[in-house]
Every structure is written in structure tokens, then in C-alpha cells.
UniProtKB/Swiss-Prot annotation:
Its main location: mitochondrion. GO terms for biological process: mitochondrial electron transport, ubiquinol to cytochrome c. The chain crosses the membrane at residues 34-54, 78-99, 114-134, 179-199, 227-247, 289-309, 321-341, 348-368. It comes from Pelecanoides garnotii (Peruvian diving petrel). The keyword Aminoacyl-tRNA synthetase does not apply. Binds 2 heme b groups non-covalently. PROSITE patterns: CYTB_CTER, CYTB_NTER. GO terms for molecular function: metal ion binding; ubiquinol-cytochrome-c reductase activity. Component of the ubiquinol-cytochrome c reductase complex (complex III or cytochrome b-c1 complex) that is part of the mitochondrial respiratory chain. The b-c1 complex mediates electron transfer from ubiquinol to cytochrome c. Contributes to the generation of a proton gradient across the mitochondrial membrane that is then used for ATP synthesis. This is Cytochrome b. It holds the Pfam family Cytochrom_B_C. It is a multi-pass membrane protein. The gene is MT-CYB.
């Protein structure tokens, strides 16, 4: 009998073990769709980004015009740009839901998978940041200036570091050129990290909503979950195309329709919506270094998740108090996102400070305490 090429060919064998014959817990819900959705996001972004890069000029005098030219004169250039800009938003929606799923169902106990995931998040944030600078509008320029300037808060080497990153004494042509180079490079780094992420995941196998060992009840990925994932693709690509075709500038900043001008500062400098929660935490601390540390901690705190797990049960499925706390955390993040978009004045300052304190308190103090409390409750 001829050998099955899918199972014997060195390359096809890897694809087969990852996407076809992969044993998957039979009870995973739609919350497990986001890994494949993120893959689709990444591929879409790389494809549209490559097409945009063919028409883009990384020069301060030409960048803005080259983007306008792409939208006006290139065949479907407007669509490619709108898909790329809004695709970033959907990328972040998916990754935040993916992380939320991981926190809720205790997936962070697969430490290697979780840690590579957090590194992926940081890389994605860096990619989105440098990408936002490329159109060279007002918000691009001032966003780059404000965020890179934060590194000057690092004692002793800060100022040198910032000037080294800028390639001069202010954000200028060298900065734009290197940001374009980085924006082109980082997505491929994300692809590599995703493969590592997937390798670690397939070492242990997927978690499931019950958080119990599922070795006795697994089914092949194809056709069951490959088909289920296609539903997810449709449910994501439909709103993405709707947004890109009907309201492409809904999530953008009107300031970015004005070419960058170092002599005029916009009244409210703020990042894209997906960074607002971290931006609100940064702004809530009046000290520069303190703000930078809080900003870093707001994301790096995810590395601590496995060590803060004190519950005997893995998931929150049967832990009602932890569930309540989790949804309070979600609401808190939405409040932070809203506050980050508002001007720095009363009452937004105090709301931001309270929400920032709540964010760290829930993650660092309340989750472990409630986990231990629920362990006690299991004994009664």
C-alpha cells in the first residue's frame, strides 16, 4: 500500500500534525477560535501591508503625499489602506479577547505558551506603534514624539537612548526611515514567534472550559474545528469589510488628515483606541518615571499570572466570586479606555487614578485572595 503523503512527507507531516490530525478536546467553545482568527489577521495585515509598501515613500517630505497618492490613484489603494488600518483594530480586538479567554480559563498555567504569547503581544504593540507613525500626519508625528520621549525617564541613559532612537535631536527623517524598516520587519518576527507559541501549545495540548485533563476525549482538528473556525472567519471578516467600506475613518483621529507640523501641537495627543487603557494608566501618575513604570507594568503584569494562581480549580467556570472579579476587571479596562480618550481635567484625572489602582489591585491582590477563599469554601 502506498504511504499516505500527508503523514510521511517531512513538511506535510508538520502541517498535518498542526492542522489536520491534531487531537483537540471535544468540548472547547468558540472562545478557542481566536488563535486561528489572529492567524488570519496577521496574514491579512502582511498582504495588505506589502501592497501598501510598494507605493509608500519613507521620507518626511513625501510620506503623507505617498499615502494620499495610494488612496487616490492606485487601483483599490483606498480599500487596501482601509483594510490595513482597520485590520489592526480587529487584530487587537482578537488578541484582547484571546488574552481574556486565557485569564478566565486558566490557560496561563501552560507557562511557556503564555510567556511567548505575552512577548507576541509586546511585539504586536511595537509594530502597531511604529506603523501609526508612517502616514506622517499630525497625530503620527506627535504620538511618536510623546511615546519615544518616555524613554528619557530612564535614569542616566534615558536622553542618550531617545536621541539614539530618533537618529537626531527630534523626530525627523531618520526616525521615519527606521520606523518603516521596523514596521516591515516586525510582522515576520511575529510569524516566527507564533510558530514557537504553537509549538509550545502542541506540546501540552489545548486547555478546555472545564480545565480538566481531556486526553480520554479528543477529536481530530479537521473537519470539526477547521469548519468551526471558518464560521469565526466569516464573523470577523464581515464587520472588518463593513467598517473598511462604510466607515473607514471611524476609529482614526481627524488630526491625521493634517500633514505633520513640528511647530503646531494638537490640543489632545492620544494614541489609537487599543492603547488607550495603557495611556490612561501612564497619565494617571503625575511623575514621569512613575508613569512609565506603571505603563510597562500594565502589560508586563501578565507574566505574573501563573504565579498569582492560588485556586485549586484551573478555570473560573465553577468559581463565581472570581468570575465577578474578572468581569469587574473587564469593566475597569473599558473605563480606562474611555478615560484615556478624554482631556486631562477634572473629573477624568481622578477617575483614571481610581481605575488604575483598581486594575493593579484586582490582578495582584484580589485574584489570589479570592482564589484562596474559594479553596476554603470547597471544604464546606
Amino acid at each position: 500500500m502506498a504511504p499516505n503523503l500527508r503523514k510521511s512527507h517531512p513538511l506535510l507531516k508538520m502541517v498535518n500534525n498542526s492542522l489536520i490530525d491534531l487531537p483537540v478536546p471535544s468540548n472547547i467553545s468558540a472562545w478557542w477560535n481566536f488563535g486561528s482568527l489572529l492567524t488570519i489577521c496577521l496574514l491579512t495585515q502582511i498582504l495588505t501591508g506589502l501592497l501598501l509598501a510598494m507605493h509608500y515613500t519613507a521620507d518626511t517630505t513625501l510620506a503623507f503625499s505617498s499615502v494620499a497618492h495610494t488612496c487616490r490613484n492606485v487601483q483599490y489603494g483606498w480599500l487596501i489602506r482601509n483594510l490595513h488600518a482597520n485590520g489592526a483594530s480587529f487584530f487587537f480586538i482578537c488578541i484582547y479577547l484571546h488574552i481574556g479567554r486565557g485569564l478566565y480559563y486558566g490557560s496561563y498555567l501552560y507557562k511557556e505558551t503564555w510567556n511567548t504569547g505575552v512577548i507576541l503581544l509586546l511585539t504586536l504593540m511595537a509594530t502597531a506603534f511604529v506603523g501609526y507613525v508612517l502616514p506622517w500626519g499630525q497625530m503620527s508625528f506627535w504620538g511618536a514624539t510623546v511615546i519615544t520621549n518616555l524613554f528619557s525617564a530612564i535614569p542616566y541613559i534615558g536622553q542618550t537612548l531617545v536621541e539614539w532612537a530618533w537618529g537626531g535631536f527630534s523626530v525627523d527623517n531618520p526616525t521615519l526611515t527606521r520606523f518603516f524598516a521596523l514596521h516591515f520587519l516586525l510582522p515576520f518576527m511575529i510569524v516566527g514567534l507564533s510558530m514557537i507559541h504553537l509549538t509550545f501549545l502542541h506540546e501540552s495540548g489545548s486547555n478546555n472550559p472545564l480545565g480538566i485533563v481531556s486526553d480520554c476525549d479528543k477529536i481530530p482538528f479537521h473537519p470539526y474545528f477547521s469548519l468551526k473556525d471558518i464560521l469565526g472567519f466569516i464573523l470577523m471578516l464581515l464587520p472588518l469589510t463593513t467598517l473598511a467600506l462604510f466607515s473607514p475613518n471611524l476609529l482614526g483621529d481627524p488630526e491625521n488628515f493634517t500633514p505633520a507640523n513640528p511647530l503646531i501641537t494638537p490640543p489632545h495627543i492620544k494614541p489609537e483606541w487599543y492603547f488607550l487603557f495603557a495611556y490612561a494608566i501612564l497619565r494617571s501618575i503625575p511623575n514621569k518615571l512613575g508613569g512609565v513604570l506603571a505603563l510597562a507594568a500594565s502589560v508586563l503584569i501578565l507574566f505574573l499570572a501563573p504565579f498569582l494562581h492560588k485556586a485549586k480549580q484551573r478555570t473560573m467556570t465553577f468559581r463565581p466570586i472570581s468570575q465577578l472579579l474578572f468581569w469587574i476587571l473587564v469593566a475597569n479596562l473599558l473605563i480606562l479606555t474611555w478615560v484615556g480618550s478624554q482631556p486631562v481635567e477634572h473629573p477624568f484625572i481622578i477617575i483614571g487614578q481610581l481605575a488604575s489602582i483598581t486594575y493593579f489591585t484586582i490582578l495582584l491582590i484580589l485574584f489570589p485572595i479570592v482564589g484562596a477563599l474559594e479553596n476554603k469554601m470547597l471544604n464546606y
